Amino acid sequence: MTAENQSTVTEFILGGLTNRPELQLPLFLLFLGIYVVTMVGNLGMITLIGLNSQLHTPMYFFLSNLSLVDLCYSSVITPKMLINFVSQRNLISYVGCMSQLYFFLVFVIAECYMLTVMAYDRYVAICQPLLYNIIMSPALCSLLVAFVYAVGLIGSAIETGLMLKLNYCEDLISHYFCDILPLMKLSCSSTYDVEMAVFFLAGFDIIVTSLTVLISYAFILSSILRISSNEGRSKAFSTCSSHFAAVGLFYGSTAFMYLKPSTASSLAQENVASVFYTTVIPMFNPLIYSLRNKEVKTALDKTLRRKVF
């Protein structure tokens, strides 16, 4: 993030989600509620997994890291957005904007790869249950999580470095946070090379991880169909479909944002897609991945009884 640039802009104005004053307070209250639920859900999940030894397994190790990623990348975006709802001047400095972009990309890339690791973990658990403890050793689990964060840090550094090379002559970002495509529209220099590089990098991340998830779930589905018990098959389908819905929502919204030309959709469409993967998905992930799980409910019940008595 030290690339030289000749931009005349020293600060940006964030356009926000809407220009209608009467909607500012309702939206503030809505997103404040979403953010509180996101923080409580993800912090609660991390704490619950840490306090209960029966949840110290690869599956919950990955879930706790997913909760950490969700908590972090929601916190990169939402607090500033909440301030802007009640502020007269929605300003962010050039350094602050690029820092927000960098950390957002770190965690959104990490989310892609964490979902992939979790899909692989479920594949091993369902398709190779006898080898699960051997394959998913503590050393491999730690290595996979370290790889996820390393890819996020490196990928974000490359993409943010590309954005730092652009010259910005306009200061109004038609978005509610500093994202790649809205920033490109403010550049007075050619963005073709940067846009192609970002398209390739984002495409690689999304396509490679989503294909890995799809292949893992294809094998999982094949194994589920071989379950003789209707009750067991129904339970497995229910869990698998919930996970797959969350993955599809995340990849669908990110692909809509990044795997297209920067002029291919309206501002409203871009905002809706962004809201899904920056605020809604981090709120729903603890519910979809964890709180519907009987082991988590049992651990929560034991923890609450331990505190009461």
UniProtKB/Swiss-Prot annotation:
Pfam families: 7tm_4. One of its GO terms (molecular function) is olfactory receptor activity. It is found in: Cell membrane. It comes from the Eukaryota. SUPFAM superfamilies: Family A G protein-coupled receptor-like. GO terms for cellular component: endoplasmic reticulum membrane; membrane; plasma membrane. The keyword Cell division does not apply. GO terms for biological process: G protein-coupled receptor signaling pathway; sensory perception of smell. InterPro entries: GPCR_Rhodpsn, GPCR_Rhodpsn_7TM, Olfact_rcpt. It is a multi-pass membrane protein. Keywords: Cell membrane, Disulfide bond, G-protein coupled receptor, Membrane, Olfaction, Receptor, Sensory transduction, Transducer, Transmembrane, Transmembrane helix. The chain crosses the membrane at residues 29-49, 57-77, 91-111, 134-154, 196-216, 239-259, 271-291. Residues 1-28, 78-90, 155-195, 260-270 are extracellular. Disulfide bonds join 97-188. Residues 50-56, 112-133, 217-238, 292-309 are cytoplasmic. Its main location: membrane. The keyword Oxidoreductase does not apply. PROSITE patterns: G_PROTEIN_RECEP_F1_1, G_PROTEIN_RECEP_F1_2. Belongs to the G-protein coupled receptor 1 family. Odorant receptor. PANTHER family: OLFACTORY RECEPTOR. This is Olfactory receptor 8A1. The lineage of its organism: Eukaryota, Metazoa, Chordata, Craniata, Vertebrata. The gene is Or8a1.
